[in-house]
């Protein structure tokens, strides 16, 4: 029977890929710095995670019971209780940047009360977020802000500032998702309009005499 790795902590995720744990409740990671690449594994998330995938170094073959729409240049998100099966591409070193944080990090903050509004964390969602080049840079800039805060000595403002920057990233992702679905709706409507025009032309030409 396949073993399921329980990612109940940030430290457990860092251990899986050979990262140094800077903070017990949050990590900003870059897969180019990873030293461990299990060829295939299944994880049960106990933390929140978002990843910007920059190449085809791995594939998520199962996300719950659905195949994940996960291509190059996309963001995927995971929440506590979700199960994911990952297969590494043996010919390509994975390139991805990501954020992992434990629910305890945001406990008692305004963000904790808003998490249910970030629908891209939903278990039923199997669609990745496809970013433009500008959006990718915004995503990376948000990660850098969090990373800068993690590199500072902890003080009474640390938790609040880290949480606020995570919330900023999540709000940007909501904006990007909205843009993605609006764009798709316009494209689908355009296709339907052209199809209806073709039908009108067909019936005009073939109208019974």
Where are these regions (language model features)?
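Generic protein-terminus/edge-of-domain signal
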Residues: 1-68
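A hydrophobic/aromatic-rich effector-binding and dimerization subdomain
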Residues: 20, 89-152
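Amphipathic, well-ordered alpha-helical segments in soluble domains
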Residues: 49, 138-145, 165, 169-172
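A cytosolic small-molecule/anion-sensing beta-strand core signal
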Residues: 54, 71, 80
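Histidine-centered metal-chelating micro-motifs
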Residues: 58, 76, 81-87, 106-107
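Short acidic-glycine-tyrosine-enriched beta hairpin
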Residues: 65-77
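Short, Lys/Arg-enriched, Trp-marked, Pro/Gly-tolerant hinge/linker segments that flank
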Residues: 130, 153-160, 175-208
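Amphipathic alpha-helix face/heptad-repeat signature
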Residues: 135, 142, 158, 162-165, ...
């Amino acid at each position: 029977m396949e073993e399921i790795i329980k990612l109940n902590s940030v430290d457990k995720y860092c251990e899986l890929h050979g990262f140094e744990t800077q903070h017990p409740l949050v990590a900003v990671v870059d897969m180019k710095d990873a030293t461990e690449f299990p060829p295939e594994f299944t994880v049960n998330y106990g933390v929140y995670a978002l990843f910007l995938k920059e190449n085809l170094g791995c594939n998520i073959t199962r996300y719950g019971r659905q195949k994940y729409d996960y291509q190059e240049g996309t963001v995927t998100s995971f929440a506590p209780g979700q199960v994911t099966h990952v297969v590494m591409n043996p010919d390509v070193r994975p390139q991805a940047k990501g954020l992992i944080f434990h629910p305890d990090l945001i406990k008692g903050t305004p963000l904790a009360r808003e998490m249910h509004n970030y629908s891209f964390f939903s278990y039923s969602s199997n669609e990745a977020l496809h970013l433009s080049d500008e959006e990718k840079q915004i995503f990376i800039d948000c990660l850098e802000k969090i990373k800068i805060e993690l590199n500072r000595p902890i003080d009474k403002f640390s938790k609040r500032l880290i949480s606020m920057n995570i919330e900023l990233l999540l709000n940007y992702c909501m904006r990007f998702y909205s843009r993605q679905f609006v764009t798709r709706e316009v494209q689908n409507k355009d296709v339907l309009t052209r199809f209806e025009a073709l039908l009108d032309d067909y019936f005009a030409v073939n109208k019974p005499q």
